[in-house]
Amino acid sequence: MNRYMNNAVLTVLLLLSIPASADAMRCKNALITEGDSTAEMLLKCGEPMLREDITRNEENQYGNVVEVKYGERWTYNFGKNEFMRFVTVRNGKVIDIENGPRGE
């Protein structure tokens, strides 16, 4: 019986040690997930290393193609032992989180 309990505890600990999925990221002791506000992310993670506009071309009412800002891509670098994270934000909300290469 004791052996089964040890195995169960070990299994739970191993599952808890698995990194968060690609639609979430850990900042210090906080977790950021898709749908969180950018204000919440700034409080938990601080300023990103880089902010880039995401644009796309759209046709306006006069038939002209214009470049429209669609959102932003924020880059977080948590150091050389961690993966960089690319966070897409739009209208003040996190809409996507992607893993990048190892940080510097």
Positions of PLM-derived features:
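Residues within mature, well-folded domains
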Residues: 22-104
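Hydrophobic alpha-helical targeting segments used for export or membrane insertion
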Residues: 10-14
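N-terminal signal peptide c-region/cleavage motif recognized by signal peptidases
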Residues: 17-19
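Bacterial N-terminal signal peptides that target proteins for export
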Residues: 1-9
